[in-house]
Amino acid sequence: RYDGTNLFGVDPKYKFNPMWSISGAWSINRERFLRDARWLDNLRLRVSYGAQGNIDRTTSPYILGTWNSTSLGGASEDRIDVTSPPNQNLRWETTYSWNTALDFAAFEHRLGFTFELYGRRSKDLITTRTIPSETGFISTSSNYGEISSKGIEFTLNTVNIRTRDFRWETSINIAHNTDKVEKVRIDDNSWSPSLQGYSSGAVFAIKTAGLDENGIPMFWRDGEKISLQEFVGFRVEASDPWGLGIPEYFEYGPAMNVSQKDVRSYLTYAGSRNPDVTGGFNNRFYYKNFDLAISCNFVLGQLMTRSPFYNPAQTNPGQNYTTEMNKVWSPSNTSGTYPSLTGNLQADGSAWGDWDENPDPYRVYYWIMDNFPTNVNLFNSLDIWNQKA
């Protein structure tokens, strides 16, 4: 298969990209040495390898702009704001993937499993890179990024009970997947660290060192505990009562002596939003014209980012809060683990952030009943959900 697009550069070699795959299977149970294994229903080894392309429709080889207006001499004039410079060298993103699997079934398909190994590597991913400002732009898109992933998955299916009127089936699935950003560029003015060498779901956070005697956060820097204001190295502004150093609150000018590079160095790897292990199991019961399904899903080794349950600079006595507010530091609760309150009015400013934590396995239970007899007219299917985190 040979696909082409006019969304890339003018050079014909960038317009087309071959898509191909090759696969094969070996039905081992049909071999002569297993001919007498009557109990074996299926034993098959599968392998595949191939390449496929992807088009990033957010980019273009042509100059892009948005229609706008401006004031010139007191009169409104139309203008075009250039949002993307022309780039004639963009090409397809390409992904190479391989897969190996073993299928097994026995005892009239009452017991079966699939064991699978897979890997993927995507190249020429379109990323943003910094270019000299003399060009009139500060960044452009280029085929530079690269990411890889690999994993293992196991699925077990059983028929536990099978009679004339009743059948009980179980399916269990568990998978482990890892991914890694092999190549990526970041702008010099980026506040976030590079993902290169980390998972695509990597989370970076500032490592805290508890609270001081006034309930204000402290941080680690170069192995030492330092105050929040000293940590970011500039004066506390009214719009940033703790001196948190949140980028949008930075006071540009002589008061600021912290750079984007400094901020990136403060951030440490906290974990990944991509779970290490996922899985679940499903039980399905059939009795005459009724069937009932009970399922559970889980994830392990995942970091979650959640918004704080309160804003220390914007609290309201008339607002409902969770019981976690009892853990907020105050002069009467010096054992509190959450930062103290610094304001109670909207005008006091804002000091929001994200909290990173390792959650309990996420479980979703649900029951499904359907295939009711035709003389039951109330409903044809009943779904009952119970979700717990």
For each of these PLM feature ranges, what is it?
Residues 1-205, 379, 383-389:
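Extracellular/periplasmic, surface-exposed regions of secreted and cell-surface proteins
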Residues 169, 272-300, 373, 377-389:
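Conserved C-terminal beta-signal and adjacent last beta-strands/turns
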Residues 80-81, 258-264, 372-379:
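Short glycine/proline-rich turn/loop motifs
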Residues 142, 159-271, 304, 308-315, ...:
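Conserved small-residue
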Residues 53, 121, 178-182, 212, ...:
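Short loop/turn segments at secondary-structure transitions that flank enzyme active sites
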